[in-house]
Amino acid sequence: MTNIRKTHPLIKMINHSFIDLPTPSNISTWWNFGSLLGLCLAIQILTGLFLAMHYTSDTITAFSSVTHICRDVNYGWLIRYIHANGASMFFICLFLHVGRGVYYGSYTYFETWNIGVILLLTVMATAFMGYVLPWGQMSFWGATVITNLLSAIPYIGTTLVEWIWGGFSVDKATLTRFFAFHFILPFIIAALAMVHLLFLHETGSNNPSGLISDSDKIPFHPYYTIKDILGVLLLISILMILVLFSPDLLGDPDNYTPANPLSTPPHIKPEWYFLFAYAILRSIPNKLGGVLALVFSILILMLFPLLHLSKQRSMMFRPLSQCVFWILVADLITLTWIGGQPVEYPYIIIGQLASILYFTIILLILPIISLIENKLLKW
């Protein structure tokens, strides 16, 4: 009898993707984040579904419905905090996943990398719209400030903003459409993730050395399934410690105050995972310039394959590039810190210097260092 795993049309696809998949024998823990992102997405879709059963997307009742979920629904508080902190875990895994891709040169798989950047943008859009839904002070003012940025687009800007708002300010129409988009986008993300995997399995996985590993492949199951389970247990442990001991650690206290269009919070800031981009936006005094810098701070990832001038794929054997990479990581941490600080001296100048350094490292320093390393290695 033939093995059903290898003959059944549906099970055969799963088999080729997760069981008999030939995988490089030397991939490290940095390759765990793909599966962890899949887990995060599943957690977010499930908890989000249960939250949507009790949530109402109306400006009058939205805040009360979230309170009702936390107080009256069975384990509603748990579902809500898993969803809120699950988003933070999602972004931690995303940043580490992208960082791994940059360090080990995974961006040379053009299609996989570009779909990944589109995925990152979609997840960011989804998270932003989700932050608006509880209709607290920071939800309302965050939505107002970020959507208003589109008014910097010449000619059509103001019309575009009012079209997104569904009126002349952030109101019921805005909240309703944000809820609709926040609900549908995770399913689009899941579909894009499938395309991401499809392209990845066309070429096979990269590995820390950056060398072709066709001569040394092992089956995904049991070697990497057991390794992924370890990552899953660690992720769930960290998430549950966060949820059960300090659920509001990464949130903003202002969001426990119902939205009030007549009272502006002293410091309007997004969730922690957007602070680096927010700092870049604030560093440029010109509105349009700031918006372009904000968009380009993410889209610049698409340029990595074009800026790769090294003869080696991975940074594993390139100590100079490694130093520059870790300076870039430190710079992003600095930007995240600056994004949460008030707009005053010395934070303004630190933010501007960190923003300049961010673009300079990616566009100039890394390619130049790559060429220097080629010379040193007589390539």
UniProtKB/Swiss-Prot annotation:
UniProt remark on cofactor binding: Binds 2 heme b groups non-covalently.
Transmembrane segments: 33-53, 77-98, 113-133, 178-198, 226-246, 288-308, 320-340, 347-367
SUPFAM superfamilies in UniProt: a domain/subunit of cytochrome bc1 complex (Ubiquinol-cytochrome c reductase), Transmembrane di-heme cytochromes
Keywords, comma-separated and alphabetical: Electron transport, Heme, Iron, Membrane, Metal-binding, Mitochondrion, Mitochondrion inner membrane, Respiratory chain, Transmembrane, Transmembrane helix, Transport, Ubiquinone
Topology relative to the membrane: Multi-pass membrane protein
Binding site for heme b b562: H83, H182
Subunit organization: The cytochrome bc1 complex contains 11 subunits: 3 respiratory subunits (MT-CYB, CYC1 and UQCRFS1), 2 core proteins (UQCRC1 and UQCRC2) and 6 low-molecular weight proteins (UQCRH/QCR6, UQCRB/QCR7, UQCRQ/QCR8, UQCR10/QCR9, UQCR11/QCR10 and a cleavage product of UQCRFS1). This cytochrome bc1 complex then forms a dimer.
PANTHER family given in the database record: CYTOCHROME B
Name by which UniProt lists this protein: Cytochrome b
Taxonomic source organism: Marmota himalayana (Himalayan marmot)
Taxon lineage: Eukaryota, Metazoa, Chordata, Craniata, Vertebrata
